[in-house]
Amino acid sequence: EAERDKQQALIMEMSTPVMQLWDNILLLPVVGLVDSKRVQLIMETALQKILDYQAKLLILDIQGVPAVDSAVANHLIQITKATRLMGCTSIVTGISPEISQALVNLGIELGDIQTQATLKDGVSFSLANLGMKLQTINTN
């Protein structure tokens, strides 16, 4: 039983990877179904990594989330508020047309939460926010 609990905890931890993309920028890709237990783990993991890396921006990519209901949307809002309290701006990326429509139909206001259509847009926005940009180098 203890071994099973350990394995379950490891699986949950692996399902919420937070990685550093750049100085002050973290990425948290969320894949699969999100319930309240998982959201709690996502929040705890994100807040700890923000502290560890002294991050100023967290990209929360939800492209891999198949559906969002009002509970999940409210949890995402809570995560962005918690990160803001730590001095870190959250950027939600990967909002599909279906999720966008569901949020509108549910009457959920994202308020002042920063959103970008794609992860690429979120990375560009984050770099610009820090006064940087990616540039193509001509090697000819």
Residue ranges and their predicted role:
Residues A2-E13:
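Short, charged amphipathic alpha-helical "coupling" segments at sensory-output junctions
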Residues L21-M43:
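STAS-typified acidic loop motif
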Residues S36-K56:
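A short, well-ordered alpha-helical element
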Residues L51-S70:
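Short, glycine-/small-residue-enriched flexible loop/hinge segments at domain edges that mediate gating
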Residues G64-E109:
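Amphipathic alpha-helical interaction surfaces in cytosolic regulatory modules
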Residues G111-G122:
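Short acidic-hydrophobic, aromatic-tinged amphipathic segments that line or gate anion-handling sites
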Residues K120-T136:
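A charged, well-structured terminal subsegment
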